[in-house]
A protein has these predicted regions:
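Short, cysteine-centered beta-strand-loop-beta hairpins and adjacent loop/turn segments enriched
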Residues: 70-74, 102-113
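Hydrophobic/aromatic beta-strand elements that line small-molecule binding cavities or substrate pockets
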Residues: 64, 82-87, 100-102, 116-123
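A mature extracytoplasmic/lumenal domain signature
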Residues: 40, 50, 99-100, 135-138
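A short, structured loop/turn motif at beta-sheet edges
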Residues: 86-94, 110, 122-130
Length: 185
């Protein structure tokens, strides 16, 4: 049996990696957190695009709940279509890396593609293949989130400047109006 409820049990490393990859992508895109974490090692370390580090399947579940599924999620929708750039297989363990081609819609309606880079380490523990570590990152100096933040900052700066300008105009108008009319200051 290549796949059980407990995870991927295919003895051939390359076939097992392909099966595990398919399970992870499908469960992620379908928001099936139970299935996703069932493919993680009990000691898994996951580093997300925002720099947050999760330890163990429960840490991943907690992150998912807070960011995606909870009462006030940051992310409304997401999808990923990862492409492996390369992979090194060393018998019972392997390292893969590539591009996630990940797309997001935030709760405020902002949509963007990150094209996060990833590195994943998987290993066979007994008969079952599990993810040992996963790291996703984005270019800190050039990514769509920076543009969203800059746009929001510019919008709010403009609104605040307009309010201050209106208040200053009203105050200055009253002061100058009093001077012209000869009213005491």
């Amino acid at each position: 049996m290549a796949q059980t409820k407990q995870g991927v049990t295919e003895p051939d490393a390359l076939k097992a990696i392909a099966l595990l990859r398919g399970e992870l992508i499908d469960s992620f895109n379908k928001r099936d957190i139970d299935r996703l974490v069932s493919n993680l090692d009990p000691d898994v370390i996951v580093t997300w695009q925002n720099g947050e580090v999760c330890r163990g399947p429960q840490g991943v579940r907690d992150y998912y709940q807070r960011m995606i599924a909870g009462p006030d999620p940051v992310v409304k929708t997401f999808s990923s279509d990862p492409v492996v750039a390369d992979r090194h297989v060393y018998g019972d363990w392997a390292v893969s890396w590539g591009n996630l081609h990940d797309q997001y819609e935030l709760k405020d309606g902002e949509k963007f593609t990150l094209n996060s880079l990833f590195t994943a380490t998987i290993a066979r523990r007994g008969d079952v293949w599990k993810v040992e570590s996963f790291h996703a990152s984005v270019n800190a100096f050039d990514n769509p989130i920076l543009g969203i933040v800059a746009k929001k900052a510019a919008t709010w700066s403009g609104i605040i400047a307009a309010i201050i300008g209106v208040i200053a105009g009203v105050v200055l108008g009253r002061i100058l109006g009093r001077r012209k009319s000869g009213a005491p200051q």
